[in-house]
Amino acid sequence: MSQDAARSIPLKRAIMKAYTMRKDLVVAVAVTGILAAVALSSRAEDNPAALAKALPEASVSLDQGLKASEREGKPISGKYEIEDGALQLSVYTMKGDQFSEVIVDHKTGAIKKTEKITDADDLKNAKEQSQAMASAKVSLDKAVEDATKANSGYRAVSVMPTLDVGKPVANITLMKGEDVKKVTEKLD
């Protein structure tokens, strides 16, 4: 083997090592970005302190947000959440066989945005929620109103319908400060 060939082997190894390190860095940055996005989207159960801090800026109650979304379809779930670092009131609606996410302005009650639900997990959840609401005789806004009346000082931050032994119920998350309370209201 010539001296030039012998010298080029360590150089090739150094180039390959630098390439591998650069590739690992790109993967690490991508994973960090994904984790940050997940952390910015949180529910009351995940980060009650963040939601408790942001909730006072909302003058629209969850049941009012559900009512406001009715022009886009039948509300099948709703929640306050921290999305991209900001408070957001999100309501899933159903019109025919189409599902949408309606973003309600938490200060005015006006509809800010409506988007068709296309994400597979979100679509699966919407279908399950619509099945529960198909046999419901009580609307979600009424269930939320009843839950908040029965729990003085608490504010509803989410409502998710489900079937419990074949009967429709609303699982409602309430908050008072950072205190999180879960209640169930019958929908039949």
Kindly label every feature range from the protein language model.
Residues 2-188:
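Long, terminal "pre-/pro-" and other extracytoplasmic accessory regions
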